[in-house]
């Protein structure tokens, strides 16, 4: 995929939503307030981690009562401010089929396994979509309190300052993030051969266990690029907007605009995004 193709894909996916600047700012305020309330619930849950109830949703995929309480808390904030909006959230939202109008897409605890093991790397992620297009988004790193925000056409910010993707274009200087497809055997077989090609050419690969934070760290220039083969809407909705507004590119593995759906995801600064797709698709057997 050429640089112009990737840029065009990014532009096509980043059409301004049917909302004014003031409306997008209001949606961002809701995202931030809801994420902050959910983060409070998660922090309180961390203090009683040993007594939490935890269930398996599938192969190595877990949910705790903190996930559910966090989702309920953020849902309360959203419904108070936008009673007609739809909530699409990870832990069984009844509105999961809706895509039109105003939809809030939320992961109440991204990095549940990290949380359950006491690893301080997990987040709350919320995006507001207008007719399927991200209009505003917020990600909170719960243990550190770091806040990442963006509005469509209004830029991305971290700790109150504008965010920009890294300018590193040399793979040898690049740090790449990824996520393992651990829940699906067929995806593991597809993914594992990708690692050597990236590992040989870059300064390192990191797998931290929370896709929302990986995307936020691409947006603020800590990582040069990120890829994962299968992500859900709540994993990427806010992160997609952060990266685009920070000057980066987000597509599927085949270079198409990255939808807010179950999808593959390749993200990065323009140079490293192009390099990563070329490397993943054209790697040696």
Label the model's feature ranges.
Residues 55, 96-98, 131, 149, ...:
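Solvent-exposed alpha-helices and their adjacent loops that cap or buttress functional pockets
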Residues 1-109, 278, 285:
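N-terminal subdomain of lithium-sensitive/metallo-dependent phosphomonoesterases centered on the IMPase/IPPase/PAP
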Residues 42-45, 67, 78, 112, ...:
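Residue-level signal for inorganic ion chemistry
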Residues 98-157, 172:
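DPxDG-like acidic metal-binding loop motif
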Residues 31, 35-38, 137, 156, ...:
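Small-residue (primarily alanine) positions within well-ordered alpha-helices
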Residues 68, 72, 91, 108-111, ...:
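Generic detector of well-ordered alpha-helical packing
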Residues 164-285:
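An extended, acidic
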């Amino acid at each position: 995929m050429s640089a112009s193709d990737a840029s065009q894909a990014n532009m096509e996916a980043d059409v301004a939503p049917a909302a004014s600047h003031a409306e997008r700012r209001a949606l961002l305020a809701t995202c931030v307030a809801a994420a902050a309330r959910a983060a409070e619930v998660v922090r309180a849950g961390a203090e009683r981690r040993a007594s939490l109830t935890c269930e398996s949703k599938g192969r190595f995929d877990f949910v705790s009562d903190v996930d559910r309480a966090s989702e309920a808390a953020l849902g309360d904030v959203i419904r108070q401010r936008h009673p007609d909006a739809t909530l699409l959230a990870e832990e069984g939202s009844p509105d999961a089929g809706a895509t039109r109008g105003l939809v809030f897409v939320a992961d109440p605890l991204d990095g549940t396994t990290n949380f359950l093991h006491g690893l301080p790397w997990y987040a709350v992620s919320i995006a507001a979509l207008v007719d399927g297009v991200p209009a505003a988004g917020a990600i909170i790193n719960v243990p550190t309190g770091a806040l990442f925000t963006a509005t469509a056409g209004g830029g991305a910010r971290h700790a109150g300052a504008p965010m920009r993707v890294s300018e590193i274009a040399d793979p040898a200087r690049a740090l790449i993030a990824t996520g393992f497809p651990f829940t699906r055997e067929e995806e593991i077989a597809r993914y594992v051969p990708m690692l050597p090609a990236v590992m040989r050419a870059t300064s390192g690969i990191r797998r931290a266990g929370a896709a929302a934070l990986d995307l936020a760290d691409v947006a603020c220039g800590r990582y040069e690029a990120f890829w994962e083969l299968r992500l859900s809407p709540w994993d990427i909705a806010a992160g997609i907007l952060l990266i685009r507004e920070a000057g980066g590119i987000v597509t599927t593995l085949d270079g198409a605009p990255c939808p807010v759906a179950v999808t593959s995801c390749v993200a990065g600064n323009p140079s490293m995004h192009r390099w990563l797709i070329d490397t993943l698709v054209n790697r040696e057997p």
